[in-house]
Each structure stands twice: as C-alpha cells, then as structure tokens.
Amino acid sequence: MNKEQLEKMKNGKGFIAALDQSGGSTPKALKEYGVNEDQYSNEDEMFQLVHDMRTRVVTSPSFSPDKILGAILFEQTMDREVESKYTADYLADKGVVPFLKVDKGLAEEQNGVQLMKPIDNLDNLLDRANERHIFGTKMRSNILELNEQGIKDVVEQQFEVAKQIIAKGLVPIIEPEVNINAKDKAEIEKVLKAELKKGLDSLNADQLVMLKLTIPTEPNLYKELAEHPNVVRVVVLSGGYSREKANELLKDNAELIASFSRALASDLRADQSKEEFDKALGDAVESIYDASVNKN
C-alpha cells in the first residue's frame, strides 16, 4: 500500500470522482454526454468513446488534485492509456489516487436487497490491479427495503470480499447503497449503521476499509463510523439526487465527502469546446469540493 496515497485519502481536503460506469450503464452515460447509440456499432467502439470522454475529464485542468483526492475506474479504463501512460499511473502522477470498481453487478432482489453477483476471478483481477498500481477497490450492493436479514446479508458479503481485497494489499471501498426512495430510509440506515459497526469491529487493527454510503436522512448519523480506527474515510454517493440537492445534504454531514459520478458529469457534453467543457467540469468540481470541505 502506498503510504503517501493513504495519507491523502485519510486527511486530504477534497472528494473522489467516480468514473466507473461499466458495461450496463455505459450507453446511458454516453447518451447524457451527447453520444447516441448510432455513433458506435459494437462494444469496442463504445468503450473507446467512453474512454475518450474520461480522458477528456482527467486531462482537463479542472480535474485538479487540489480538489480531487481520488478517482474510481472501471476495469476497461484501468487497461487503457491516457497520454501514453496506463490510466492509474497518469492519475497517480497527477496526484489523484486510483481505485478500481471490482463488482460484477447486482443479483436479483431478495429480502429487500440486491447482493453482489459472485465476483469470478477476483484474485486475478486484484493481481492485475496491483500491477497497474491501483490503491483501492469499490463494490456496490443495493438496499431497497427495511429487512434486517437482507441488510445483514449485504454487510456480511461486503466484509467477506473486503477481507480478500485487503489480503492483496488494497483498500476496499464498501458500498451498501440505500435507495433514496426507500420508504423507511431513516430506519434502514440505523440498521445498516449497526451492522457496519459490527463488521468494522471484526477487523484486525491493520485491516483498513473505506465506506461509500447514501447521504443519511439523519445528519451526522455516520460520524461514529467515520471516526472508527479501521475506516480511512467515509464517502457518499449522489444516489439519484441532483448535484445541488446532493451538495446541500452533504454540507449537513461533518465528516463525509462526496464520491459522485453522474452529479459530477451531468453538465459535460461531447460537442462543447475545450473552454466550455473545462468550465462546466470546473463548476461541478468547485461545488462538490465546497460541499465536501465547507460544512454547515
């Protein structure tokens, strides 16, 4: 583990850019960027276009290490290059800590939750991540209803896989998303917090994780988790809120910082000039940084 990167993730001012839309969500991400499905004829072309979009983001002067602590990449992005360097090396050289999305998507809903599908060849993927100088990983589950067994299952699965990731020298971001429209959202979050605390308490002193959570209904609910000795940082997802709304809610949570994807890229378009693109990205970065650093 890179100690300098660990220090930046633990104490740096800023947020994490989530650039990890994968196979299923790529056409949608491209469409929002202004690239329609008739502009590519196969998956290779599609992934090349999305890599071009991400390259444009990370090479922009607005993508500044003074504001952006880390970036989460999709496996395809890890294996591609930006300005003749592998993406993670490009980011690290710029001062941005690279993470890799490792999950293979969500299983069918059961007990009010969606567990992660089995991650085949995880060891192999983690070895490749180490070769590519990746610092940490990210994996997402989804909680839709107040079901204690389901929430327990989500957290147990996350910690089980997290321990495998830690054993390879990487820092896992555990992401049990709570659907923002869940009818008992506040109650779900209390159960989730208790289960996460159990999971954290089961770790050895040298087993470090990060958490990526939905912004809680009750402000500062996760403060105790952020202060847990095994937690490097707690980050939040935008989860379907607009950027303005997500930022507003984030400001009410003292220890949390953003890890936004759609809310970061929502104003970026393929046909923008360099100046327009850099300004749109810069405005987004500025507002998300502000919500992550300057609290109410």
Curated annotation (Swiss-Prot):
Q: Which GO terms describe its biological process?
A: glycolytic process
E.C. no: 4.1.2.13
- What UniProt keywords apply to this chain's record, in alphabetical order? Glycolysis, Lyase, Schiff base
Matching Gene3D superfamilies: Aldolase class I
Single Gene Ontology MF annotation: fructose-bisphosphate aldolase activity
What residues form the catalytic site here? 175 (proton acceptor), 212 (schiff-base intermediate with dihydroxyacetone-p)
Task: Specify the species.
Answer: Staphylococcus aureus (strain COL)
Q: What is this protein called?
A: Fructose-bisphosphate aldolase class 1
Gene of this entry = fda
What does the similarity note say?
Belongs to the class I fructose-bisphosphate aldolase family.
Q: Which InterPro entries match?
A: Aldolase_TIM, FBA_I, FBA_I_Gram+-type
SUPFAM superfamilies linked to this entry: Aldolase
**What pathway annotation does it carry?**
Carbohydrate degradation; glycolysis; D-glyceraldehyde 3-phosphate and glycerone phosphate from D-glucose: step 4/4
Which transformation does this protein catalyse, written as a reaction? beta-D-fructose 1,6-bisphosphate = D-glyceraldehyde 3-phosphate + dihydroxyacetone phosphate
Looking at the keywords, is rRNA processing present? no
* Highest taxon above the source species: Bacteria
Q: What class of enzyme is it?
A: lyase
